[in-house]
Design a protein with these regions (language model features):
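Conserved small/polar residues in nucleotide/adenosyl-binding loops
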Residues: 1-5, 185-192
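N-terminal accessory/capping or targeting/presequence segment of soluble
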Residues: 3-116, 171, 176
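Extended, domain-scale alpha-helical bundle/helix-rich regions
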Residues: 12-35, 39, 122-156, 161-176
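Short coil/turn segments at secondary-structure boundaries
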Residues: 46-49, 126, 150, 178-182
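A glycine-rich phosphate-binding loop feature that marks nucleotide/adenosyl-phosphate handling sites
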Residues: 49-52, 128-130, 188-191
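Phosphate- and divalent-cation-binding pockets in alpha/beta enzyme and binding domains
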Residues: 54-55, 133-134, 179
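C-terminal structured domain segments across diverse proteins
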Residues: 114, 166, 172-179, 187-191
Length: 196
């Protein structure tokens, strides 16, 4: 169908340090599990790439101009399984994830993991971001809770570290936007904007 499909990056994912995240991965996982309990969910399939990156404090280059990576996370009360492409997670990141109780599986493994959930499991899925195949993988006897992801409001409320980093980024951006017109007015007759 598509003659020129974009190639997925082969670059490995990397960890976002606590100096940027402001909250440890284990604490975020605990907060999401508490939200799952509030919703009456036994399992939660995280499907939105930005939510996955935020929750695990990982970043990647799989999508142009967006620091996310392709993957899914199946979170239960006791377990967390990150499903990502082969080679996406290096040994150092793997060890860090394992220290926080996150196991790894193949990207396509999410469907089998969801199908293997026991009868009576209440699976939280955000229908706005979950793909059809995943929604159809929920086994008979399990209940799908099609609700907005609890990660969205958590991501929206910035902690003190995130707020300070946003201030710094806006300051740097403001300086760049202020300098550009000055540079533009000083162009010589033979120069173009591309020369800046």
């Amino acid at each position: 169908v598509y003659k020129r499909q974009s190639v997925v990056s082969a670059a490995p994912v990397w960890e976002l340090g606590i100096e940027y995240a402001g909250e440890a991965r284990a604490d975020k996982l605990a907060r999401v599990r508490a939200a799952m309990a509030d919703e009456g969910a036994d399992a939660f399939a995280v499907t939105a790439l930005d939510e996955l990156a935020w929750l695990l404090d990982l970043r990647g280059n799989d999508v142009a101009c967006t620091p996310v990576f392709l993957g899914f996370l199946l979170l239960t009360k006791e377990d967390a399984v990150l499903c990502a492409r082969a080679g996406a997670v290096g040994e150092e990141v793997k060890a860090s994830l394992a220290a926080d109780g996150v196991r790894l599986a193949d990207y396509e493994g999410i469907y089998g993991l969801v199908r293997a959930l026991p009868r009576g499991t209440r699976v939280l899925l955000d229908g706005a971001t979950a793909n059809y195949r995943l929604t159809q993988s929920v086994p008979d006897g399990a209940e799908t809770l099609d609700r907005p992801s609890p990660i969205v409001p958590m991501k929206a409320v910035k902690n003190a570290v995130e707020q300070e980093n946003l201030r710094r980024a806006h300051l740097a951006d403001g300086i760049a936007l202020t300098r550009f017109p000055v540079s533009y007015t000083h162009l010589r007759a033979h120069e173009t904007c591309a020369d800046l």
